[in-house]
Amino acid sequence: MNGSFLAGAPRCADTGAQNAHLRRFPRPSSVDVRTKYASLLGTSGALHLGIFDPPGTGPVTGPCGLEAMIEIDGSMHSGSGTVLRYAVALAALRAEPLHIRNIRARRAKPGLRPQHLQAVRACAAFCGGRLQGDEAGSREIVFHPGRTRRGGAFRFDIGTAGSATMLAFTLIPLALFAETPCRFTLTGGVFQDFAPGAFHMRDVLLAHLEPMGARVRLRVERPGYVPKGGGKLLLEVEPLRSTLVPLRRLEPGKPRRFRGIALASRLAEEKVAERMAARCRELLAGDVPVEMDVQQDESALQRGAALYLGAETSTGCILGADQAGKRGRRSEAIAEFVVSSLQEDLAAGATVDRHLADQIILFAALAGGETRYRIPAMTDHVESNLRLVEAILGARTAREGTVIAVEGIGLKP
């Protein structure tokens, strides 16, 4: 493959631009056919992995016959709950035990929060695994994944306004490798700060997974906001029929259409949704069409609002930005933030937005071949996820400037 990791020095195969050499992240060195060791340094310490075998070969044993276990420092790079979610999902796919410590060590309230607790418990329930240390506030857990992936119907309630969309993100890769279709009913927060909303997940992430061969549907049954939560998502995942197809997105193109959703719950009199939509149209006025879907909702447990805006480009790229409402946050300010965020990513020449930049890494690492795309900027989340898929799955990753490359392991369903 031209420009692949497997043929000499890798290059960015971007037409219209000079090929650039990619910097490889360090890879675990082989000890023998079945066993590898690795030590990958993070910004606040090391990500240490115990003995583990190449993907697909099953569990191995370490010295004295002890079961091998993946050891991860949860404070690496972003030190966020994303490290935990990624690690648990990847360990479940490998069916290998995981010990993760220093969970969310950099956060004001470190340790497991309800949404993280539900994510690891959901993974365990789905694959028939066992957990140790799974309690609120815990800074370390041990996860022994099972090998069952039967599919079926599942219900998970976070019990707070914690992100149900991030729970969905944790479950999607596991469900893709289930024996039968999966149907998840997820209750919690659907639109809040510090987590992409459900519209972004549906219209951006799932839109990119479809050409990779993943059939995933997401529907908002009821919006949920901070602090009451109570939102409901319906997530349906079909098992993969073949290995995921790698994604190539190197030409950003020009915006050819903007499409947005302005949602307001129990705020019809204040015309919050209409004001967000109107401000978006004002800021985007020009030759590019702007389509805004104004939605009024009365089913949420509280007042709330959310705005999503997506851009479709001439080369088929889809980028998005969103923000939830908050007390004291004006409708017009929400629109200005969302439009500005999207325009910044487009101006950077990115082919994916700042959220998809790290979200797509896990799926690229599972695909059979090399995925390449341009990100708006390097972030701790991107760095963390690249290192995790290298270390746990054995995927190869590289970057040059804002070009990310991931050589997937080709995990078969």
Segments from the language model and where they lie:
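Flexible, glycine/charged-enriched surface loops at secondary-structure junctions
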Residues: 130-134, 181-182, 213-223, 284-301, ...
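Conserved mixed alpha/beta catalytic, RNA-binding, or beta-rich assembly cores of soluble enzyme
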Residues: 194, 211, 244, 249-354, ...
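A generic, well-ordered mixed alpha/beta core segment in the N-terminal half of proteins
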Residues: 116-217, 234
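C-terminal functional modules
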Residues: 373-413
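Proline/glycine-anchored alpha-helix kink/cap motifs
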Residues: 84-98, 122-125, 145-148, 164-185, ...
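Phosphate/diphosphate-binding glycine-rich loops and adjacent basic-rich segments that engage nucleotide
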Residues: 149-152, 157-161, 177, 204, ...
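N-terminal basic/disordered segments at the start of proteins
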Residues: 68-94
